[in-house]
Regions:
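Short, well-ordered beta-strand segments enriched in hydrophobic/aromatic residues
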Residues: 39-45, 49, 171-179, 291
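Acidic (Asp/Glu-rich), glycine- and aromatic
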Residues: 51-54, 60-63, 164-211
């Protein structure tokens, strides 16, 4: 009887140790937590980002889906803002254009979500060694009246999150827009600023700095020309803690080594301007835009 109890105790201890060991393995690496709102990506139990799948609005206005918020820094603090009071149509990490044209006529304003809606129609996740990729398909639907809408553009986006390595993290964005009709084009604001395209709505501490090609950059009201990367450095974790940085890199569609940027020190977004004021047509092969974020400490 005593021998049986000893064997049973050993067996239960083995099961407990196996469970603890298995749980630790599961907790290591990347994990994707799905909910009705979207998908949260974590690494080793620490939050990395959230991809908004369900359309989200502010009191029924500025409804949007298919963007990243929150984005977390390497210390687990939130870097981005969503529906800020000063510009409630800004959404974390997002891409949008004022001019969405069909046969030369503006049919929607994607920047302020006027006459357009976004519907995430497909999602897929893939884990590889040292990375996780989120594949999404998003339908851009133009409102035609009486509560009806028509799909106009199909977006295919891949967001790839790399493991934190040497105290930095790389996140890649690969965005392709396919027109569902002929003669569709997209463009930025129809003014001298021409803003529109890939944007970051970051929290902006008072000590924010902009660095491109190892040179401090001073924002201006209109777009400035700088290198294809811009480092945003600030006390994102609080004024008493060390600074950290978010580097945004564009993989230029054109071979121009410079890039137009809209930069703001307070209450606004940061924007890689593309294509600018003049709309660019969407070919049936798709318009591809690639960007990279690098989260890093400041030495």
């Amino acid at each position: 009887m005593n021998l049986t109890r000893i064997h049973l105790t050993k067996f239960l201890l083995f099961v407990l140790l196996f469970y603890i060991h298995s749980t630790s393995i599961v907790a290591q690496g990347f994990n994707a937590i799905e909910s009705k709102e979207g998908i949260e990506i974590t690494e080793n139990g620490r939050k990395v980002l959230f991809y908004q799948v369900k359309p989200k609005s502010l009191n029924g206005k500025y409804e949007r889906a298919g963007y990243v918020h929150p984005l977390y820094d390497l210390n687990g603090n939130i870097l981005t803002e969503d529906f800020p009071a000063d510009h409630p149509y800004h959404h974390g990490i997002f891409w949008a254009w004022h001019q969405i044209k069909l046969r030369g006529h503006v049919v929607a304003d994607g920047w302020v979500a006027d006459s357009i809606s976004w519907n995430v129609t497909a999602l897929n996740l893939k884990k590889d060694s040292g990375r996780i990729s989120l594949f999404s398909e998003v339908s851009w639907n133009i409102k035609t009246g009486a509560g009806k809408s028509t799909p106009l553009i199909r977006e295919e986006t891949v967001i790839t999150v790399c493991s934190e390595n040497k105290k930095q993290r790389i996140i890649d964005f690969d965005i392709v827009l396919y027109p569902l009709f002929d003669s569709i084009s997209i463009g930025g604001s129809d003014d001298v600023k021409g803003y529109g395209g890939f944007c970051m709505r970051l929290r902006l501490p008072a000590d924010i700095e902009f660095v491109s090609n190892d040179t401090l950059v001073t924002p201006s009201e209109t777009a400035i020309r700088a290198g294809k990367s811009m480092d945003f450095r600030a006390s994102f974790d609080g004024p008493s803690l060390p600074k950290s940085g978010v580097t945004l890199i564009t993989m230029p569609i054109e071979k121009d080594p410079q890039q137009s940027w809209i930069l703001r020190k307070e209450t606004s977004m940061q924007n890689i301007v593309y294509p600018g004021r003049t709309p660019v047509p969407l070919s049936r092969r798709g318009l591809r835009m690639k960007y990279q974020l690098v989260l890093h400490p400041i030495d």
